[in-house]
Swiss-Prot record:
It comes from Xanthomonas oryzae pv. oryzae (strain MAFF 311018). This is Diaminopimelate epimerase. Belongs to the diaminopimelate epimerase family. Its EC number is 5.1.1.7. The gene is dapF. Substrate binds at residues 20, 53, 73, 83-84, 167, 200, 218-219, 228-229. The record marks 278 as: Important for dimerization. The active site is at residues 82, 227. GO terms for biological process: lysine biosynthetic process via diaminopimelate.
Length: 284
């Protein structure tokens, strides 16, 4: 068990994927997932353990999967997709002996993901098919998918691509990612009525056709050192515009990810590191 109901203690593992950090809880014994207040308390970097998201390991939901996982943002809200988290869950399952093959399946809140164990502590995860249709993102006010959308925001016009990778993303191409107004524009887009479920906002700079730089302002978290689904979103939006090749390196503040999308009718595959930091016990 991860939770000791008699004492209030909670055992956990701290992990990160390219700097996107997680508190991982083993709930396969049926222990209830954290409520919003507990998730926010655990994620607090001053009064809790500290992380971007909480990951809960649970019993599998689909045939053939070895386990499932839930995702909780640092503000206590539930999330539906987390690419860096998927790699960390995969590594945790391998370390615990639950996943014993080089290839296996895990269930996220939105779908089943095929995972491949690579060399050097890296994992590849099939992230599903990108959805560009506005109702699927969801993006209100647009009937058909476009390469670029424009929204008036506080007197300015913000131009962006939009896609769902199991969660909504807006992708803003910039000349210099270091100078991008990440928090200001990210917050304005998240609060815009065009995104009824809010949105993760990526700011991407094309270095060359095989390399981009990216910063992501995540809903429920803020700017993170890395965002796996955000890296997928930025890559596929640029691929649709023929700005980059179908196999691209994404440099984020916390590390490097590789995104491959062989063709429009195949799944996006993300690969990158999964790192164990420490195991601990939270006393509540």
């Amino acid at each position: 068990m991860s939770a000791d109901g008699r004492s209030g203690r909670l055992r956990f593992t701290k992990m990160h994927g390219a700097g996107n950090d997680f508190v991982v809880l083993d709930l396969r014994d049926g222990t209830p997932p954290p409520d919003a207040a507990l998730a926010a308390q655990l994620a607090d970097r001053h009064f809790g353990v500290g992380c971007d998201q909480i990951l809960t390991i649970e019993a599998p939901r689909s045939e053939g999967a070895v386990a499932a996982y839930g995702i909780w943002n640092s503000d206590g809200s539930a999330a539906r997709q987390c690419g860096n988290g998927a790699r960390c869950v995969a590594a945790w399952l391998v370390r615990d002996g639950i996943a014993q093959c080089e290839r296996f399946i895990i269930d996220s809140p939105v779908t089943a993901h095929a995972v491949e164990r690579l060399e050097g502590g890296r994992y590849a995860v099939a992230m599903g098919m990108p959805q560009f249709d506005p109702p699927q993102i969801p993006l209100a006010g647009f009937a058909h998918a476009r390469d670029e959308y424009a929204l008036p925001v506080h007197g300015d016009t913000v131009r962006f691509g939009a896609v769902s990778m199991g969660n909504p993303h807006a992708v803003v191409e910039v000349g210099r990612v270091d100078a991008a107004p990440v928090e200001r524009v990210g917050t304005l887009l998240q609060q815009n009525a065009a995104f009824p479920d809010s949105v993760n906002v990526g700011f991407v700079q094309v270095v060359d056709p095989t390399h981009v730089r990216l910063r992501v302002f995540e809903r429920g978290v803020g700017e993170t050192l890395a965002c796996g689904s955000g890296a997928c979103a930025a890559a596929v939006v640029l691929m649709q515009r023929c700005r980059v090749e179908r196999d691209v390196q994404v440099s984020l503040p916390g590390g490097e990810l590789r995104i491959r999308w062989p063709c429009d009718h195949e799944q996006v595959v993300m690969s990158g590191p999964a790192v164990f930091v420490f195991d601990g016990e939270w006393n509540g």
